Amino acid sequence: IGRIEHGFRMRPDLVATDNARNPRDYFGHIYFDSCVHDDAALRYLIDVAGIDSVMLGTDYPFPLGEQEPGSGIIALKLSNVEQSRLFHGTALEWLNLPYSRFAQDDTE
């Protein structure tokens, strides 16, 4: 995003020809998956895009995903709330589905 934003600011004649909106303003409207195969890259993605824009990725049906899906998320040693956000919260929000639809009711 830094390179695109730099072009937007420095060369609007090339980059901002059809849109006066800064490319960084689109963050929060774009979603990313966690399957980046690098702990530092995942940390950076979360820091730049925001945890609310990142969700678990598996690369299914392709055989290039993590050996254990979610292991990259676990490796970051995030809080339980942050892990829950990445494992299911962001996806449920994006799909406009309530958590209760999938949660087990332990009160019965």
Regions found by a protein language model. Give the residues of each.
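Aromatic-lined glycan-binding groove of carbohydrate-active enzymes
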Residues: 1-27
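Mid-to-C-terminal alpha-helical segments outside catalytic/metal-binding sites
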Residues: 31-32, 36-55, 62-108
